[in-house]
Amino acid sequence: MKLDWMSFTFALRNLLRQKGRTGMTLASIVFGVVGLILSGGFVEDVFIQLREATIHSRLGHLQIYREGFYAHGSKEPYAYMIEDPAAVEAKAAAVPGVVDTMKRLNFFGLLNNGKTDLPIIGEGVEPAKEAKLGSFFFIIEGRQLTDDDAYGVLLGEGVAKSMKLEVGSFVTVLANTPDGALNSLEFEVVGVFRTFSKDYDARAVRVALPAAQELLGVAGVHAVVVSLADTLTTDATAAAMKAAIGGDGYELKTWFELDDFYAKTVDLYKSQLGVLQLIILVVVLLSVANSVSMTAYERVGEFGTLKALGKRSGDIARLIILENALLGLIGATLGVLLGIALALGISAVGIPMPPPPNSNVGYTALIRVVPSVILVSFFIGFLATVLSAILAARGAARVPVVEALRQNI
């Protein structure tokens, strides 16, 4: 049997003649494709939202340090200062794709509320620039730190709760200077913040950069944080920036290198998605195989008649495969269309999600329409149907003519 237009027409008529079986098989294919599109789109949204929360709550897209700071800076913070941050910022800002740069000065110290002390991680920041970056840096009490707050301080949510502090309270921050002396400054609490990391919120405080430099008795900074227009250009921009500043005794880290939690989460979800895809593939394969096999069994008499009229076993097998290839094509296409429609509809409403591990911040999940997921889902639905048809066709085509014709009696 040649695969011409008449063959396709004949196959389509056979599908329409078996409306019940065709409908059951279509439903199985559509269900599988829709399930893959929705699950893949949901996981992709988790990746995107976690990525952007990581970047825009604290890390930025890139961070530039003095060479050796990332490996040894926690032990010798003052040995790896950027003494001329303006020059570094100028070079970084000249790289295409960079939106903004901001300086940070890190320190360890003690926070005193007049009664008790709490070890803290402090950051001296440029408030106006940080406010633009921090779309996932939530002020839950008070207000954002501003450039006019010479001695204002933002407290992490955990710090404020542990020390029983509120907006308007005064605290003392103590830290060691480069020569080993202990220095202190008094600050007024202007706000309480919450980020995507509960551990960070439990120890972090932020003050204006000049106040941090006064507290530590230094003029430099530890890091220059870089914000980009598009997260997807991070690697390319990092490569260009390394070429611009790498030979001057500086090192550069991307947000991905600074946060291993994201990498572990992505690996976990990809493994789970892979298992889910395998389960859906098996379910679709078994459902379609059962439906196709039943249809082929019910049509054994018809196949016997075709053989009696001169058709060969190969012709019968090709007919069954062609019919189900058309069915798989139609079912996968319908599944894609329905999956996209459901993804857009669900995203319009949103899915309220609880805070992930190590976070106090819940979020609204979406179902992303991801071209690669749609393509994979389409081919899984189509190939599962064709594979099932091949298995059924081998059995149906081998039935002897006499035995097949006996089914017509």
Residue ranges and their predicted role:
Residues 46, 333-377, 390, 394:
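Short helix-loop junctions at transmembrane helix boundaries
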Residues 1-37, 408-409:
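N-terminal Sec/SRP start-transfer signal
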Residues 40-121, 144, 148-149, 243:
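Hydrophobic, regular-secondary-structure patches
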Residues 104-107, 116-126, 138-210:
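Hydrophobic secondary-structure segments that place a key small or acidic residue at a functional site
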Residues 293, 302-346:
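Transmembrane alpha-helical interface segments in multi-pass membrane proteins
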Residues 369-409:
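C-terminal membrane-exit region of the final transmembrane helix in multipass inner-membrane proteins
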